């Protein structure tokens, strides 16, 4: 009986070494730009992957024959648009290498806009959504607070330098609303971001940009509506998502967090680099 148990364990270990590798990533706690600078920040950021590690891990995994697929949980804490764009590009390149990609989320923007989360999801082959979730496509708007009136009421004085009309960072302190150039710059930014989201939705659904823009403007959508409109591919819970991913990967498939994969590959490369010849 003991021998049989040991034999089973050894067989499972062999399968883990030779079976397909499924990388997983959880982005619901956000993503970190740089390593934490102090102990408290490090503790608070323990569940937040570093952007550089994610990008480098995906780059390594593209060329790794052992890696079969990638499954990512999206939603929760918001990620900045610039980071989302980098992640979208990296996942698109990973997918184009021939490996399967699956995104899933409990919701994409429940009670808040989910444009960035859904834009990231469009980089994947398949999108799963929890049956109680939403796809928060709401169109894009940008806003800015101005403090000139409050500072005047408080009697606070300040000195601000400003060189050009489009350098408008100081406008929050010096103006009570948008200047012409500042409004123009912000409108161009909003138009560019909306164009990227529209193009991503149009490409994924294989529809004209005008139809994609209509879908964005008419949101948000509950899960059943999103499925009917093909904004998501399936409704289900985590266990159903992973069952499909494992079945698609084949016998012996096993999971590994992308962060651990990145660290192990980096360590292996350093060992080869410094190994005496």
Question: PLM ranges: what are they?
Answer:
Residues 239-247:
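A ligand-binding cleft/hinge motif common to bilobed small-molecule-binding domains
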Residues 217-224:
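Extended, domain-scale alpha-helical bundle/helix-rich regions
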Residues 110-112, 214-217:
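A glycine-rich, coil/turn loop motif that links secondary-structure elements
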Residues 1-205, 246-277:
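Small-residue-centered hinge/linker elements
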Residues 201-215:
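Secondary-structure end/capping motifs
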Residues 128-129, 232-238:
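Short acidic-hydrophobic, aromatic-tinged amphipathic segments that line or gate anion-handling sites
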Residues 146, 221, 240:
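Residue-level recognition of oxygen-bearing side chains
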